[in-house]
């Protein structure tokens, strides 16, 4: 595995939790760096995204050069890390590409995705307007948002408590990589009950309503240290991922029954996406001028719309593949030529079974 320092830190920690750290060789590559695995060579181009050190990949092959840009946005004030490297992307296009793979997440969204900079100010203002205990839930991997939540607490005289194992893990790795350096030490969740409700802010996992995440346990009254009551507030600093509406709704209903105020991106400016909207996609097409676009990172309707949108905006050719399909990009026109096994696997004793297979379906029914 080749990755930037932050991703390597996450991977090493996950592997160590399962006893696999010695079985997976990991090579750390600096942001903007590169590596070779013959017959391929790969160069990194820094991109702004909600996860630190996100990189586009310029993959050199004997058949041509491919640009893979999965998660990115054009954020003038990303807060952690550099802005998206326009010069590097232009240079990749000028060298000549066979194809570009590109993020499709926000292809239905007009305009330009918001910036983390103004969001930080807004989040502090929203917290300032609350009088009771405040919980902010977010994607744990969004270190810039975590830092914004911490700074919102500090600006309003509140101590910060992290609740959720993934938040602790990512905060530790972020600090090891040089992030979150100006943030205070966190309060242990066991000590929250000794603090005045208006003097604490809790960062919690579970923005998507995950059953065993911290926020769901707090909402159900199952958390051993954290309780909420009327006058408290939960801020969802995240988007509602399609398919998670019911689980998020269950958590929000449980909170509402306790008299907790719920604030989402529909109510206040508390979230921005980490993915490009239509104006940014147009800009990238102009910088790179890809001869062929392969839309990635989205459901079928996103990929199909991105294909249509790219053709409408001057990209000469597009192609689309589904998970497990093998696509030949060159020589000749792009086409699917094979299939490989894909999808999630579950561990059943000492064997791997398909996550959607009969074994796991039967256990869920039981």
Where are these predicted regions, by residue range?
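His/Asp/Glu-rich metal-coordinating catalytic cores
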Residues: 1-195, 213-227, 246-249
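C-terminal regulatory/interaction regions
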Residues: 151, 155, 174-366
């Amino acid at each position: 595995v080749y990755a930037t320092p932050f991703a390597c830190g996450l991977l090493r920690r996950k592997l160590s939790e399962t006893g696999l750290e010695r079985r997976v060789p990991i090579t750390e590559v600096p942001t903007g760096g590169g590596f070779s695995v013959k017959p391929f060579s790969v160069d990194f181009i820094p991109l702004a995204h909600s996860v630190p050190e996100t990189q586009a990949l310029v993959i050199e092959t004997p058949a041509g050069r491919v640009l893979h840009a999965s998660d990115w946005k054009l954020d003038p004030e990303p807060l952690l890390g550099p802005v998206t490297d326009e010069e590097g992307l232009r240079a990749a296009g000028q060298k000549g590409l066979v194809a570009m793979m590109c993020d499709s997440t926000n292809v239905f969204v007009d305009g330009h995705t918001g910036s983390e900079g103004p969001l930080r100010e807004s989040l502090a203002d929203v917290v300032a307007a609350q009088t009771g205990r405040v919980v902010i839930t977010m994607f744990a991997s969004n270190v810039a948002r975590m830092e914004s939540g911490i700074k919102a607490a500090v600006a309003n005289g509140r101590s910060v408590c992290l609740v959720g194992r993934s938040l602790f893990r990512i905060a530790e790795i972020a600090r090891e990589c040089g992030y979150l350096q100006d943030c205070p030490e966190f309060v242990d969740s066991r000590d929250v009950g000794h603090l005045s409700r208006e003097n604490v802010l809790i960062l919690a996992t579970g923005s998507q309503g995950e059953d065993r995440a911290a926020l769901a346990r707090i909402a159900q009254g199952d958390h051993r240290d954290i309780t909420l009551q009327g006058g408290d507030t939960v801020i969802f600093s995240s988007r509602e991922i399609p398919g998670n509406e019911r689980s998020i709704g269950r958590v929000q209903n449980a909170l509402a029954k306790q008299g907790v105020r719920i604030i989402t991106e529909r109510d206040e400016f508390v979230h921005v996406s980490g993915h490009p909207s239509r104006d940014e996609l147009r800009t990238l097409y102009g910088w790179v001028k890809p001869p062929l676009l392969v839309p990635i990172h989205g459901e079928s309707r996103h990929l199909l719309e991105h294909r249509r949108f790219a053709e409408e905006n001057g990209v000469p050719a597009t192609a689309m593949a589904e998970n497990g399909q093998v696509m030949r990009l060159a020589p000749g026109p792009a086409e699917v030529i094979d299939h490989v096994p894909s999808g999630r696997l579950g561990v059943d004793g000492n064997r791997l079974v398909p996550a959607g297979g009969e074994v796991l379906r039967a256990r869920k029914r039981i």
